[in-house]
């Protein structure tokens, strides 16, 4: 968000259930989530109530954020949205699934002679950043091992799907909500090159509603979608700056003078903290 941006909409007082990405807002709705699951797996579940949401909301503040975690039959699925490439996702998912399993067996004894059954995990990332990425990429935990001889004793695989407009077309056709989400993101990116971020997001929302794209969702959640979109884009921009700074720091052969990464809070972090404290968008605009 740029200084001087004028915003007047209000959002509900935020709480620990606050959704920090449009993707998470959309697919936290069970009907949308079951549609996404069916598209990814080729299944045809009709009853969204078969899903049990097990996302660890407090894990966001522990640095172990995962957008969506749910159980279906005997499996547990971890879905995450990413707008920047992150090779550490398998390690993060390993820690996250450990917390999930700890909660799952909390009231059961792991020292008994009876085998404790647990849901089989499936890990997936939905990527819509600006870096060129294949439609499907497999990330492996073993890639992080400093030295590895032979097959790893511990492996974790994450399937990353490129969900930018024009990618994974068959998947998009199977999940209309995902397809329309990709269109919305593309509109925001297009207009940010032509106008300030606040106006770009507003225009993208207006156009999508007029063209029948995510109509019900955008009308119902307009103010929150607008703020979250601004936060997302600002975060994406800050992460790009961070990577550039890290690259430049590396070119200086380890010299630390003049470069301090991660010391100051970004504007997005400040806004996010204000939202969690219950500030309205109008008040946030006044102080930022």
Segments predicted by a language model, with ranges:
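Elongated, amphipathic alpha-helical interaction scaffolds
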Residues: 1-288
């Amino acid at each position: 968000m740029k200084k001087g941006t004028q915003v007047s909409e209000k959002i509900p007082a935020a709480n620990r259930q606050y959704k920090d990405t449009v993707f998470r807002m959309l697919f936290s709705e069970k009907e949308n989530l079951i549609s996404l699951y069916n598209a990814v797996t080729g299944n045809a579940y009709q009853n969204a109530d078969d899903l049990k949401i097990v996302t660890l909301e407090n894990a966001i503040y522990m640095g172990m954020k995962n957008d969506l975690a749910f159980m279906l039959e005997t499996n547990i699925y971890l879905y995450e949205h990413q707008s920047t490439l992150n090779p550490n996702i398998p390690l993060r998912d390993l820690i996250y699934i450990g917390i999930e399993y700890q909660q799952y067996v909390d009231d059961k004894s792991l020292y008994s002679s009876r085998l404790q059954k647990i849901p089989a995990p499936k890990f997936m990332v939905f990527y819509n950043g600006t870096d060129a990425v294949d439609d499907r990429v497999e990330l492996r935990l073993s890639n992080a091992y400093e030295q590895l001889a032979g097959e790893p004793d511990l492996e974790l695989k994450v399937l990353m799907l490129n969900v930018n407009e024009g990618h994974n077309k068959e998947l998009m056709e199977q999940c209309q909500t995902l397809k329309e989400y990709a269109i919305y993101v593309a509109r925001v990116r297009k207009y940010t090159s032509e106008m300030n971020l606040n106006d770009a997001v507003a225009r993208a929302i207006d156009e999508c509603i007029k063209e029948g794209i995510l109509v019900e969702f955008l009308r119902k959640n307009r103010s929150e979608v607008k703020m979250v979109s601004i936060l997302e884009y600002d975060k994406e921009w800050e992460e790009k700056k961070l990577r550039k700074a890290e690259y430049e720091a590396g070119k200086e052969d380890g010299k630390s003078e003049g470069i301090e990464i991660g010391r100051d809070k970004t504007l997005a972090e400040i806004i996010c903290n204000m939202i969690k404290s219950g500030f309205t968008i109008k008040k946030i605009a006044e102080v930022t």
